[in-house]
Amino acid sequence: IKLNVHTKSQGCSLAGDKAFFCRYVVNYLLQDESLGATAELRNTAIKRGGLKVITTLNPEAQTAAKQAVDSTQPAATNWNDVNSALTSVEPGTGRVIAMAQNTELGSPADANDHSKTEYNYNVDSAYGGTRGFQPGSTFKPIILAQWLISGRGANATVNGTQLFWPTSFGWNAKCYDGGKYYYTGQPNGWSYKNAVNGGLTYGTAAYGIRQSLNSYLYGMLSQIDLCDVHDLSIKMHALDGTGEPLHSIPDLGTNIGGTKYGISPLTSASMYAIFASEGKYCSPRPIEKITKTNGETMKEYQNQCEQVLDPDIANGVSWVLKGVIQPGGSASQRGIGLPNGSAAKTGTNDNSSQTWQVGYTRGLSTASWVGSNNLGFRSLNGVGINGRVLEYVDGATYAGAQWQSFMKTIAPKYNTKDFTTPSDKILSYS
């Protein structure tokens, strides 16, 4: 007897452009103890239990997300190993609406294949992802939020003229002995630069954030408390891909996103959704409900939300960030035609190896990332990306275009009502 033996693909590899979302759902279920007391029991329930899982994915949004990341750099011609990913969540619920990246789902055997990977670039390592990617200036809204919480206004004047702070300068840090932290990581003090030349001026806090000027950021930081920033970052779930806090008090570079590990797009989108929903954080979830083979509902997944910011503070951050994508902002070319109903922040790490645009409307919060997972800190500057070679790449370049493409298509299908104007106190000049 001659047998015609062939292998049959199974599982998430059959899910097409939803393959990585499928893998995320499986890993999410593997951590759900309602499916079994042990990982082995949960795995059996998932694979052999005949369960039907109803997810939160919006097929139209997923198609738009996949088109956006593939337009940045198609997998088939990705000779330079440039990665792109995008995740969108619904503020106020945590529903994951879309999740895409510019690779096919692979296995460890595909480690040298530029078109495939086993890693989901959108999620943390616990869900099949990575340790994250340095957030760059997308961390700055947390500093802004703490600035507003401390009673300072968005239009208050900031000294943005300094690129150096001596070791003798005591940063406010109430969780340290004596209430001060003295930076000794460099013998002469803490130094840094702005992404572009200039910007060493006095101006408003809003101006400094909208232009993404590091000199303004540290001018603001010198007036507030590092320990408060750290606590707020944890409260807002600013965690790296291993689940640890992104922010580190001794490492002043983490305040501009120079973190040890990085953040995932899903975590970043969920964090920015706090501003979109006027201060409410909702844990991201990919599932609506699970039904049994007979159609009986086994479990309905509920929103898990908590108020982590005062609504006026969140609205103040939105008031500032909407200026980023308005004329005069650092990503003004990346607006989506909703000048009072959309907001965003770009992020670029030191050598442009990781770039971001994260932004939102009331109805969607979307994180867009372009960088490199396999090549570490390899810069995108001067690298061929889908036929283009640019001398300088920042968050607005490719990640911003990705974000804009997706949001222009999908955001109008959700809530695009204008943001609430913050109080006079938030907009004050002192």
Where are these regions (language model features)?
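Sec-exported extracytoplasmic/periplasmic mature domains
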Residues: 1-6, 26, 30-34, 66, ...
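Non-catalytic, structured segments within soluble enzyme domains
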Residues: 1-56, 239-240, 253-257
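Feature responds to low-complexity, polar/acidic, surface-exposed segments characteristic
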Residues: 2-15, 46, 76-80, 248, ...
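Surface-exposed intrinsically disordered loops and tails
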Residues: 5-16, 34-39, 43, 91, ...
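A penicillin-recognizing enzyme superfamily signal
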Residues: 55-77, 86-88, 98-102, 107-134, ...
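Loop/turn elements at helix/coil->beta-strand transitions in domains of secreted/extracellular proteins
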Residues: 82, 92-96, 152-154, 227-228, ...
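Conserved catalytic neighborhood of penicillin-recognizing serine enzymes
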Residues: 152-229, 251, 293-323
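Mid-domain, small-residue-enriched loop/turn segments at the edges of structured enzyme/sensor domains
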Residues: 174-182, 187-189, 225-270
